[in-house]
């Protein structure tokens, strides 16, 4: 039952993102170091990432890493923006376990699944895009009739490239 529920939820979130104008991407689960640096995961979060020594590659901590790196060397015209992508992926982090007062009640795993939405937007419109994405996620949680709240992360929980970050 759990596997079918998970598959249904993944489809629900991907379908809703596509209906909201996001292009679905099937990201790779293994990336090079340049991809990690390009999204601020490296060097900041290297201790939480799994490294494949023989090939000098990393398992993705989030689909954001390969999705945004699809555009790493692209220069956009303003008329091309926004670029909206969604992706489902397994994610891999070394932060497994349940520990400490800050994660009470959470059971952290080495592997977990996520559906992400990503926008590439002109800097003048980035905060507006962030609010749009938060509203999109909130509407989905409400459609599922789940209780929710927004947690705004503090600076110590974000990569050095982040200005704001929220979790619904």
Protein language model regions, located:
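TRNA-recognition modules of translation machinery and tRNA-sensing kinases, especially anticodon-binding
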Residues: 1-168
């Amino acid at each position: 039952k759990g596997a079918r529920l998970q598959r249904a939820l993944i489809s629900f979130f991907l379908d809703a993102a596509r209906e909201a104008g996001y292009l679905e991407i099937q990201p790779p689960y293994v990336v090079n170091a340049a991809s990690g640096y390009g999204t601020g995961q490296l060097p900041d979060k290297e201790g939480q990432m799994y490294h494949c020594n023989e090939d000098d590659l990393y398992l993705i901590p989030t689909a954001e890493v390969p999705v945004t790196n699809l555009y790493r060397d692209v220069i956009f015209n303003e008329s091309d923006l926004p670029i909206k992508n969604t992706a489902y992926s397994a994610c891999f982090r070394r932060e497994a376990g349940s520990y400490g007062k800050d994660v009470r009640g959470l059971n952290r795993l080495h592997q977990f699944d996520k559906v992400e939405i990503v926008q590439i937007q002109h800097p003048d419109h980035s905060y507006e895009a962030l609010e749009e994405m938060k509203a999109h996620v909130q509407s989905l949680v409400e459609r599922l009739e789940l209780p929710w709240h927004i947690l705004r992360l503090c600076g110590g929980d974000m990569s050095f490239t982040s200005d704001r970050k929220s979790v619904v």
